[in-house]
Design a protein with these regions (language model features):
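N-terminal Rossmann-like FAD-binding beta1-loop-alpha1 element of flavoenzymes
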Residues: 2-27
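Residue-level detector of alpha-helix initiation sites
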Residues: 12-13, 33, 229
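Alpha-helix C-terminal capping segments
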Residues: 16-23, 67, 131-135
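Conserved N-terminal/central alpha/beta ligand/cofactor-binding core
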Residues: 24, 29-103, 139, 144-146
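Generic structural signal for well-ordered, non-membrane alpha-helical segments
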Residues: 53, 57, 73-81, 187-194, ...
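Short glycine-rich, low-complexity/disordered patches
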Residues: 72-76, 202-216
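Predominantly flavin-linked oxidoreductase catalytic cores and closely associated redox partners
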Residues: 95-205
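C-terminal catalytic lobe of FAD-dependent flavoproteins
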Residues: 208-247
Length: 247
């Protein structure tokens, strides 16, 4: 029976950083993607410089640069998942996708018996510690990518159509990101709302893509990617993290 030192709930750069510096770690992620905080929600196209201080952080940074994901003050967040997967494969860090922790029980010897659900059914992972790296913030927005022949008109109309929304340039020229605040809706109900509203627009803005996940604000958890603006910074926060209790 294999016993891990740490089981991390939630895949991300902090999780990978922790796993890189703590070899007996396994990561469980409910979704089918690895970069769930930057890539999936298209969290930001503005690059915030960060210089890594660890060998692993430098290697991850090197992979990002090899794909030209950081250019000037912008970042191509669309390529983050590919870069992240390259690093994880290279380091052979254990990650279980579509894996959800459904229960946990502390045995008499102090080992945690975590029951997890995967595509193959229920199974058990035994670990000394669990870290929950998921963000619990209720402050969330949904990112909508669009193009417009008259960008000025679109940037004026969209924040009025979607109350509290903001518009920022995306990585590729001529594309923009609309950040729509989400209140009382889940990922399934908010998309029909977006589509319906979009049909009433008059500026000619063309919807390209709706992010499959919400963009969340950091909730103070140092093991949440959402607490950081740069993926390399998030990675090193996990790499140097030495928390003793479950987060």
């Amino acid at each position: 029976m294999e016993i891990y030192d740490t089981l991390i709930i939630g895949s991300g750069y902090t999780s990978a950083g922790y796993s890189a510096s703590h070899p007996k770690t396994i990561i469980c992620e409910e979704r089918e993607a690895l970069d769930t905080s930057f890539y999936l929600p298209l969290s930001g196209f503005c690059y915030h410089p960060y210089a890594p201080s660890s060998k692993d952080g430098a290697r991850l940074f090197e992979i990002f640069n090899s794909l030209s994901l950081f250019e000037g003050d912008t970042q191509n967040i669309n390529g983050f998942e590919s870069a992240f997967c390259t690093y994880l494969s290279e380091r052979e860090l254990p990650v279980l996708l579509k894996c959800r922790v459904v229960s946990r029980e502390v045995r008499d010897d102090g080992i945690i018996d975590a029951t997890v659900q995967t595509n193959e059914g229920l199974t058990h992972i035994f670990t000394k510690k669990i870290i929950d790296a998921r963000c619990k913030s209720e402050d969330k927005t949904l990112t909508v990518l669009f193009v417009a022949d008259d960008a000025t008109a679109a940037r004026c109309e969209l924040p009025r159509a979607f109350e509290g929304a903001t518009v920022e340039p995306a990585f590729y020229k001529g594309r923009y990101a609309l950040r729509v605040p989400v209140f009382g809706m889940d990922e399934n109900t908010v998309k029909p709302y977006i589509y319906k509203k979009w049909q009433s627009l008059t500026s000619g803005a063309k919807l390209l893509f709706i992010a499959p996940a919400f963009r969340l604000s950091g909730d103070g958890n140092p093991m949440c990617d959402e607490s950081y603006n740069n993926p390399i910074e998030a990675f090193e926060a996990g790499f140097f993290f030495e928390g003793g209790d479950e987060l």
